[in-house]
Amino acid sequence: MVANLPALFSLGVFVGVILLIMSEKIHLTIAAFLGALILVFTHVITLKEGIDYISQSYATLALFFGVMVLVRSFEPTKIFEYLATQMVLLAKGSGKLLMLGVIAITTPICAVLPNATTVMLLAPLIPPLAQEIGVDFVPILILMVFVANSAGLLTLVGDPATFIVGDAINISFNDYLFKLSFMGVLAIVSIVVITPFLFRHIWRSRFTHLEDLPHPQINHPKVLMAGGVIITLVLIFFVIGESLPVPIPPASVALMGACLALLLASQSKIDTVHNILRDVDWSTLIFFMSIFVIIGSLEKTGVTASLAQLLAVVVGQNIAFGAIVLVFTVGLLSSVVPNIPLVVAMVPLLKQYVVNIGFAGPEILGANFDGQLPAEVLPLFYAMMFGATLGGNGTLVGASSNIVAAGISEQHGRPISFHRFLRYGLPVMAVQLVVAALFVAWLMFTQQG
């Protein structure tokens, strides 16, 4: 087990960063950045090693950056404000239809864009619209977050956790779509079923004075049409890119889409390159890079290998039992630990466990491993992915999209307390983890059949 000072120090820094993030005393990016730099300054990990660990996750960072630029480039067209207003008008004064509208609009967007990015775009539109029709916008924001986190399971690129795990086990966009996206459907259905009970006040409401709503107009329609072509091509290549004679991974597709969107926005003069790049969420990117360094230190000092040995002792070679245990264990952990660092830590841990129990050779531990893991152990990674994604619905600090929504709510004068979010999040998380465990069990049953 862990017995050396650097390992204990790395573990202490990791736990300290997580506690700082949970306390919300300082910004999560500062907490992670500080933790990474402490490890570099104390020479637990060198700066070069830290950069190497960041570069191992280049695909995740490139995908995030590309999507952020792509989406920000088309903000001046006001397409998202227009969609939000149409959502309220289509509800025709019905709280029930409004809640279903939030689910219907958020779901497809989050299937193809990272959930935190989608929340950044749609959440700022909810408070003014809700205030116009006289309802509390906090429950609507919380519902949007639940949907965003859950819909991330619909595709490989919909959630950072799914992309990180998918990248680690080398699953293609199409394979994910056919094998695992049904779990995203089940997660959304579970929200639809539970919404009338959790949000009963708004569900039963009737709104009046809809004629007083703001009516935003779409700007630059020709640019928006061209942008629609770019986004359509990006989505098509997300699906077919990796199956082409010369494979094109999702990260490369996102970067090309971002470049074309920048070119279109700049040449049409709807915005400047400087403004678009300035508004990229650099804070989130730096947070991820810092977390990759911290997780790298856990790998280097042997903490990850020690935890893998412990997992092998507890679970043994019973993959089915281990998968079900992982759904709930990772789900509960993800409710208090942001799911990105959790997944980044769990991937090498699970790979080491697979090696320890003899299901694969040590070559799978290499950063450049591009083969396939044995089919028997894949349910472990699926279970970890589902637990990390759906567990993020449990508390305010469980996912980055939760924190984004809370910040937007506070800007509009209604802070979301930890306990208020918990009141909604706990039942949603409990239902979804049970559904995920049943789905993983079904996957293993059909695999054996």
UniProtKB/Swiss-Prot annotation:
Q: What is its main location?
A: membrane
Q: Where in the cell is it found?
A: Cell membrane
Domain of life according to the entry: Bacteria
Annotated organism of origin: Synechocystis sp. (strain ATCC 27184 / PCC 6803 / Kazusa)
**Family to which this protein belongs:** Belongs to the CitM (TC 2.A.11) transporter family.
Membrane topology term reads: Multi-pass membrane protein
Give the record's GO CC terms: plasma membrane
Keywords, comma-separated and alphabetical: Cell membrane, Membrane, Transmembrane, Transmembrane helix, Transport
What is this protein called in UniProt? Uncharacterized transporter slr0753
Single GO molecular function: arsenite transmembrane transporter activity
Signal sequence residues: none
Transmembrane regions listed in the UniProt entry:
1-21, 26-46, 51-71, 97-117, 137-157, 178-198, 223-243, 244-264, 285-305, 310-330, 340-360, 377-397, 425-445
Q: Which PANTHER family match?
A: P PROTEIN
